[in-house]
Amino acid sequence: MSSDDLQLRLALSLFHCKGGHAPALSRALRHQGSLKALMATTREAQEQYGLSLSQQALLSGEPASAESLALGDKDLEWALDSEHHLVTYDSIFYPERLRETDCPPLLLYVRGSLATLGSLQLAIVGSRNASDYGKRNAYWMARELCKAGVTVCSGLALGVDANAHLGALDAAGSDASVSTVAVLGTGIDRVYPAAHRALFQRIADNGAVVSEFPLGMRAYAYNFPRRNRLISGLSVGVLVIEAAIKSGSLITARYAVEQNREVYALPSLLSNPQGRGCHELIKQGAMLVDDPNDILFELGLKAREATEAGDTLSPTGFGNLIDTGEPNDLQPLQRKLLQRLRTEDCLFDSFLDADLASFGALNHALLDLEVRGLVSCRGGRYTIA
């Protein structure tokens, strides 16, 4: 077994070690600079870091438990797929910005492009119950930032997150190193919410999906603050689009401040309760943003010219309108869906039964129409907006 394989085995054993203190191990790694350097420290030093006896034993070369070895074997089997990656703290693919944080994870599970994972990232987060204003701006901001060479990082949640991912995916084109990164609050072998299965796959195929949680981990509420910390840790800054006063997005913004990241906030209508968190952030010193160029300027990137009509989405209009009132850049499938919805409201299964397209194609087409504000979905029933 090579030294790299031994290092990976040790990392997996430490990761799955029962009774271990993950924050203590992360801080020790941050202080020592590598797992290899941590292995060379004395037991006394390891104890001062707060490492458990079982962690100290593993670092001293003692064998891992049968349970830890079995879980490590499961990870290695998962990583046999060429698109699956186990990225340890010592790996050359471990994101440098994340390595610089106070509590970097020992291990990342990654699906997709390692180049995307290591690219310049800007986090876009916000309400799961976003208004049309929030969804449209999330899509527009993400699309324009991605076109300028910025990878968009978000959390795969409903609302703002999903629309940010879609905007980046639609802008990425042929540049495989710039797209979007989805950070999960579950194991990477689970999709949460389940409705985003098609979006998850599209991100894995064209960007990167990342998790610090073990395979099989369910969507427990206490996982999501850790996910939010990872989102901000991967990014140079965090843009908050619609957030209530008590919102997980504000937790992400707080982590960003602690990690010395820039915080940006999109203002909203005063009557919109989902925008109050953004207004509070602006009061506290977050940069008010109403144009992607505001962020590009702060990042030292070349500002993009004002969006041309028909070139991309904007908060107020989606391309050149033709006589039907539809954007002229709709796909044929989307036109068929709108044509049917003009005659009757439909459930998703109705479109499937009509054999118009595959599940994934329908899901993406309808989600894109929702983002554009052309259809709405309530209780699973689609209608013309």
Task: Tell what function each PLM region has.
Residues 1-93, 372-381, 385:
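Short, small/acidic-rich helices and loops at N termini and domain boundaries
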